[in-house]
Amino acid sequence: MSGEPIRVSRQLLSKARACVSDIASLSQKIPFFPVERVMDLGPVAFARVSASSRIGWAAIFLKAYALVARRHPVLRSWYVSGFMSHVATCSASVATLAVNRMENGEDRLWFARLEQPDQKSLLEIQAFVTQCTTRPTEELFKRQLQLEMLPRMLRRFILRWNMNSFSEKRATRIGTFSLSTLAGFNATNRLHPTICTTSLSYAPLDSDKRCIVTLLADHRILDGVVSARVLQELEEILCRDVVGELQCLSPEGDNTSTIRESP
């Protein structure tokens, strides 16, 4: 059967995809391993739908994991390579949130930073997440846009330099942990690329309100047992601290002062 001949077209990789490609390549050099836990998040789901303000799951996990990291410095640490390898530790958490947005007909991946999520209310964190999906990208992601415009060799050099820096700017430029999820699309991405020491991902809740939560961990910094304990503590904080804050946002709760204090 004759038909149209097979043809191949080609085009240059966009600057945005080239930047993501560089981050993915650097991520492959880190010895990550996944640890998973099936969490019973029924209490969180009930408190969430009962709240008078909509709080997304991304905001909930950002707050809860930052509360865990407050107690465990290893979750605020990173590996610094060199002749004598070191471990650097930041005094506070900086979250990196992976955000997908459609720009000029193209899916774009952006990386938003949020300093000290553990010190912020769920309302404040949700406002941040909402801004990441609505505000103009040229306002929110100036540094990433500047990085994309650089030649590839220089861009990779800057990324490697930041990864191996002792400066506090390392945390604000890369983050101490990251969060990436496709739960909103009824999918999972347990092995997503990251250059942070740990990264969270969560699956959609099943009919019993159970959720598979994945923690990617840099084996140079922490081991499997520690990671498993972190996930156990994360579930406890979700069902205790986060539920308590969500209940304060319910119509039956006294959330007047909470709303007044939020920007």
Model-derived regions: residue spans:
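C-terminal catalytic/motor cores of large multi-domain enzyme assemblies
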Residues: 1-263
